[in-house]
Swiss-Prot record:
Naturally occurring in which organism (per UniProt): Cryptomeria japonica (Japanese cedar)
Similarity comment text for this entry: Belongs to the thaumatin family.
Record GO biological process: defense response; response to salt stress; response to UV-B
The name this protein goes by in its record: Pathogenesis-related thaumatin-like protein 3.1
Induction remark: Induced by UV-B and salt stress.
């Protein structure tokens, strides 16, 4: 029996290190509203919550989560059961989102520990624009890009053909063609258009169309936490 105890101790120690490694890769997202109006924050995964100016909602995101996004909904009305509608960013009429929202919406996107122990994060206008936002990783690692923003008030400058109540659709969302959505015959040969150049001119760090990776994707070491701020 004397030899059994050290074996179990070793197994427990190994498991502890393994679990610590998982925790390091998980992330906390602090989502704050600095807009002079109420927004209904949404996260997939995460759900949703009403935020008055100055309020913060904190969510925990599991290690290895990819395809994650955070956005603001505007012009919402919900009943006591959490059912209702939003003018922009609506997710199937639910306060607590179970999936992605409707266009237009400014997106803070991320993939945790997606490749070589790196998180990937970006701001996307591929679904259009509704609320200015910034995304800031908390890491001070020099290999981390840092804060990225899209703080231009695009709604007031939106081309008439893309304008909707409370937001500005992307050309892909408005016309749904291969040229603007980089699909079909355009999937591997898709460049910027006058519409995407408009969005890029307003928010140079944000995705302006689906293939805008080179100037719009940023990385941080896995285990980083993030702050998303609407209007700030």
């Amino acid at each position: 029996m004397a030899g059994v105890i050290p074996v179990w101790i070793a197994l427990v120690a190994t498991l502890s290190v393994f679990l610590q490694g998982i925790n390091v890769k998980a992330a906390t997202f602090d989502i704050t509203n600095q807009c002079p109006y109420t927004v209904w924050a949404a996260a997939s995964p995460g759900g949703g919550r009403q935020l008055a100016k100055g309020q913060t909602w904190t969510i925990q995101v599991a290690a290895g989560t990819t395809g994650g996004r955070v956005w603001a909904r505007t012009g919402c009305s919900f009943d006591g059961s959490g059912r209702g509608t939003c003018q922009t960013g609506d997710c199937n009429g639910m306060l607590s989102c179970q999936g992605y929202g409707q266009v237009p919406a400014t997106l803070a996107e991320y993939g945790l520990n997606k490749f070589q122990n790196l998180d990937f994060y970006d701001i996307s206008l591929v679904d259009g624009f509704n609320v200015p936002l910034s995304m800031t990783p908390t890491s001070t690692n020099p290999n981390c890009k840092g804060r990225i923003t899209c703080l231009s008030h695009i709604n007031s400058m939106c081309p008439a053909e893309l304008k909707v109540n409370g937001g500005c659709k992307s050309a892909c969302a408005r016309y749904n063609t291969a040229q603007y959505c980089c699909t079909g015959a355009s999937a591997n040969n898709c460049g910027p258009t006058n519409y995407s150049k408009f969005f890029k001119g307003q928010c140079p760090q944000a995705y302006s169309y689906a293939k805008d990776d080179a100037t719009s994707t940023f990385t941080c070491p896995s285990g980083t936490n993030y702050k998303v701020v609407f209007c700030g």
